[in-house]
Amino acid sequence: MVFPTKEIVQSIRETYPSGCRVELVSMGYDPYSKLKPGDLGTVTHVDSTGTVFVNWDRGSGLGMVYGEDHIRLV
């Protein structure tokens, strides 16, 4: 796994501020997740590795990993 630079993490934080709404586009293999493309959620925070943590409307909380998972603003 390649971690993003500090500049990229800052850009991710600016793109996905806490409280913004996102839609799941795709995610890496996770046999325990019931999330599907199109699911919506609210960003809680972005950590130092660029992982965007989301409280999903389905009731789960899951981090979207930089370079593996894809979300978009709604």
Regions found by a protein language model. Give the residues of each.
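Basic/aromatic-rich interaction segments and small domains that mediate binding to polyanionic partners
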Residues: 2-74
